[in-house]
Amino acid sequence: MKVEDFDFDLPEELIAQTPLLDRTSSRLMVLDKKSGDIKDQHFTDIISYLNEGDALVLNDTRVLPARLHGIKDETGAHIEVLLLKQKEGNAWETLVKPAKRIRKGATITFGDGALKAICLEELEHGGRILEFSYEGIFYEVLEQLGEMPLPPYIKEQLADQDRYQTVYGKENGSAAAPTAGLHFTEDLLAKISAKGVEIIFVTLHVGLGTFRPVDVEDTTNHKMHSEFYRLTEESAERINKIKAQGGKVVAVGTTSIRTLETIASRHDGKLVAESGWTEIFISPGYTFQAVDALITNFHLPKSTLIMLVSALSDRTKILAAYNHAVEEQYRFFSFGDAMFIH
């Protein structure tokens, strides 16, 4: 298929710039994936679509405050560093601006010197392998010095950094939030659990590639960025049991889907304890083996994520739903409203 086939017109004012005061006060569009029927509801109505014996699968990753501002020791030049992926030990793959100022062997100091880095290797497109030195615990130092790397379409400063984290996130490692999970509160999850729905966690660390435009014309030529995932033995067994008993597996977010489908596609539809790196690209024509339904936000035109949701329903129904969302003034992208495809 052509990437252009996944385009739609989106007025800029519908791109949500800030989160709502109450996480659960967002709207929820409910789409029947087979018939294309649409219902306009509120997010708390999601409870009525989840039944006893179903699984609600959430991604428990946490976003790192991964944007750092430092000084090049040799010249005093201001340097911006974005952490992308942890390598061996204290070495990280990073994106550096301006990259031309940081060559192999250059050193950078952040804050009052609590964090330092040396460039080990130069990569293309401004990428650098930096090795960090610090006292104490790296993630605690990062919490003090780092900023949340908000998506490029969000122009406003975030007043409360916790609003770009899910309430249940605990595994540090993402460069972006698994945004479908931002709608849940502990109270809402407790009500869902009380109904007999099993709440199960997976981990996928979201990379910045999630915002990267698709730069090919034909979707079959697109290569996905790689992201780290992990599924525990307990979670795998619980999901397999639910599926065997006829329960639905409802994924919260495209990251949860990508984790489950990566594993299921390798093991004849079964889930097993596994961790590794996935480059799975789900687009129309893909046969889902693990997931029955999806809670997700509204995605960018021509993105791999709108291709994924089109695979779960079909392209025509998804684009019709997106046009309805525009007409009804739904809020789009990371801080926007939600969609339930079932």
From Swiss-Prot:
Pathway: tRNA modification; tRNA-queuosine biosynthesis. Its EC number is 2.4.99.17. Keywords: Cytoplasm, Queuosine biosynthesis, S-adenosyl-L-methionine, Transferase. It is found in: Cytoplasm. GO terms for molecular function: S-adenosylmethionine:tRNA ribosyltransferase-isomerase activity. The keyword Cytoplasm applies. GO terms for biological process: queuosine biosynthetic process; tRNA wobble guanine modification. The keyword S-adenosyl-L-methionine applies. It catalyses: 7-aminomethyl-7-carbaguanosine(34) in tRNA + S-adenosyl-L-methionine = epoxyqueuosine(34) in tRNA + adenine + L-methionine + 2 H(+). Gene3D superfamilies: QueA-like (3.40.1780.10). One of its GO terms (cellular component) is cytoplasm. InterPro entries: QueA, QueA_dom1, QueA_dom2, QueA_sf. It holds the Pfam family Queuosine_synth. Belongs to the QueA family. Transfers and isomerizes the ribose moiety from AdoMet to the 7-aminomethyl group of 7-deazaguanine (preQ1-tRNA) to give epoxyqueuosine (oQ-tRNA). NCBIfam families: PRK00147.1 (NF001140), queA (TIGR00113). Monomer. This is S-adenosylmethionine:tRNA ribosyltransferase-isomerase. It comes from Listeria monocytogenes serotype 4b (strain F2365).
